[in-house]
Amino acid sequence: MEFPGGNDNYLTITGPSHPFLSGAETFHTPSLGDEEFEIPPISLDSDPSLAVSDVVGHFDDLADPSSSQDGSFSAQYGVQTLDMPVGMTHGLMEQGGGLLSGGLTMDLDHSIGTQYSANPPVTIDVPMTDMTSGLMGHSQLTTIDQSELSSQLGLSLGGGTILPPAQSPEDRLSTTPSPTSSLHEDGVEEFRRQPPSQKTVVVEAGKKQKAPKKRKKKDPNEPQKPVSAYALFFRDTQAAIKGQNPNATFGEVSKIVASMWDSLGEEQKQVYKRKTEAAKKEYLKALAAYKDNQECQATVETVDMDPAPPSQTPSPPPVAAADPASPAPASTEPPALSPSIVVNSTLSSYVANQASSGAGGQPNITKLIITKQMLPSSITMSQGGMVTVIPATVVTSRGLQLGQTSTATIQPSQQAQIVTRSVLQAAAAAAASMQLPPPRLQPPPLQQMPQPPTQQQVTILQQPPPLQAMQQPPPQKFRINLQQQPPPLQVKIVPPPTLKMQTTLVPPPVESSPEQPVNNSPETHTVEETTPETICEMITDVVPEVESPSQMDVELVSGSPMTLSPQPRCVRSGCENPPVVSKDWDNEYCSNECVVKHCRDVFLAWVASRNSNTVVFVK
C-alpha cells in the first residue's frame, strides 16, 4: 500500500504470490470528498488449488497495528467509506475435495473497518454479500465466521465508522445477531416456526376446554301450565274476528281483542277467570302426580361382586351386642353358604347427624344380618334360598317382625347383628311418635346390590332421594303384592333383659303411580292380603343356594285412590254437553255450532257495550 502526496490518493493492492492480485489494478480515490463510489467487483481467475485460508491470507498486508492512530483523526477529518463488493465466481475454491459450485457467501452482521495512518482516515468496508446468484447446486456452502475474518484480516471492528448492513426480512425477525450465518439462518427459521405452533396449541386447548351446552329436553308427559283469562278470551274471539276480516293482521286482531276485553263486563270476565282458576287447580294436581311418578320410578343397576372362595366352610357368624353407648366399628359379613339377609340402611333422612359418631362426616350405616327364620310365614321361599326384605326404616336389635305375624326365635349361632347408636335413637324417637299419624312422605329409596348366587347374600343400600332397586341376572325372582295392617312394620328391640321396648314404625303412604315391572322370570306368583289401610312397598330378591324351578320376586305395590275431577262441560253458556277432543277449540266446546254461537255472543256483547255513535262495519 502506498499513499503518494497530492490531491488524489491511490490504493494499490499487491500480492507477490498469486497472479490474480496484480499491482496493475489501482483504484482512484478522491480525498476528503462527500461522495461514495461504487467499485466494480474484482474478476478472479479460476484456480482450483486455492483454499479459503489462501484467499484470506492475502489480506494480512492490510493490517498494520503500529499505523493505527487515536480517534482524533476521526473527529477532525471526515471519514471516507469505500464499498468493495467482492464477487467470487463459480469453481473458485475447492475444499476437502468438494467443488464449491454454489459460490461462497459471507454475510457480515457488522461492517469491518480499520483506520489508516494517512492524513484522511479511510475506512474500507468489505461487505461480502450479494455473491454469485443462481448457482446454488447440490454442493455444500462454506460459511466464514466473523471472528475468523477478524483474526485473519487483522481489522478492528470498533475503530472506524461502522455502517449497518441492510436488513433483510429474516434479519428483522432476529433479536440478536448470530456470529455464524448458518446458525443465524437456523435461529431465524426456529423463531419463525415457534410462535405459530404455540398459538395453535393454545387454540386447540381452548377448543377442548369449551364444552357444548346441552339443553334439557322437556318431558312430553309433564303437564302444561294454564293460560290467563285474557288468553282464553283471545282464543275465543280471534277466530270470529279472522272469519269476518280475513285480511286483518295479527296486530290489528290484537288491538280489537284488547278493546273488546276492556269493554267486556265484569261478569263475563269472571267466567274466564273462574276457568283459569279451575285450570290452575287441575295443573297443580297433575304436576304433583307427575312429580310423584318421577320420584317413584326405579333405576335398576347390577353390581357384580366377587364370589366367596370355595375352601371356605360355613361357620356361625359372631353376635354383636347392641350397645347404645358405642357404635359398631365395622360391619360383619355372614358366611358364604349360610341363608341370611344383609340390610344396609342409611338413616340420614330420619335421624339427625350425631357429632360424636365414630366416623366423622360419614353417614351412620346399620347392617343387619338376619336369618330366614325371622321372616313371616306369608312369604314362602324355596329351600336353601334367601329373601331380602327392604322396609321403609330398618331398626332392630334382636328381632324383626313384619305385619302381625310372630317372630320366630333365633339362635345366637344363626344371627349376627350390628346396631349403631343412631339406630337406637331412631327407635326411641319412633316409639315416642307412635301415637302421631304418619306423615305423607315418599318411602326412602331402595338400592339393591346383589351378588352372585355362590355367596348367598344380598346387600341393600337405602338412600333418601330416588327409589332405586338393583337386581342381578343370576338370581331368579317372584313377585308378591302385600298389603299390610296399619302398623305394617313392627320392629322389636330386645337388648338385655332389663330393657324392653317395642317400637312400631309405619312407613308413609305413597301416591299412586305407574309401577315399572322388574320381573324377568317365567313364573310369577301373586299373594295378596287385602286390607283397606296403608300399603308398604318393598322389593325382595331370592338367591337360592341350589337351583330350583320355583323362583320368587317379592314386590309390594303401593297406591292410594285419587279423587276424580268433576266432568268438564262445554264453555258456551247454557250448554251441558261434554267437550269434544279437537285441536281447533282446545277441547272446550262440544261442536262447531257452540263455537260459532259463543263467539257471536261475545262479539255482539262487545258491540253493544260500545258507544252508540260508534259504527262497526262487519263484512
UniProtKB/Swiss-Prot annotation:
Low complexity bias: start-end ranges: 320-337, 512-524
Pfam families: HMG_box
Residue ranges, compositional bias (Basic residues): 208-218
Keyword hit for Acetylation: no
Keywords for the protein's UniProt record, in alphabetical order: Chromosome, DNA-binding, Methylation, Nucleus, Phosphoprotein, Transcription, Transcription regulation
Biased composition, class Basic and acidic residues, residue ranges: 183-193
Activity regulation (UniProt): In liver, recruited to target gene promoters following treatment with dexamethasone and cAMP. Binding is decreased in presence of insulin.
Record carries keyword Manganese: no
Protein's name according to its UniProt entry: TOX high mobility group box family member 4
Organism whose genome encodes this protein: Bos taurus
Lineage summary: Eukaryota, Metazoa, Chordata, Craniata, Vertebrata
Gene name tied to this protein: TOX4
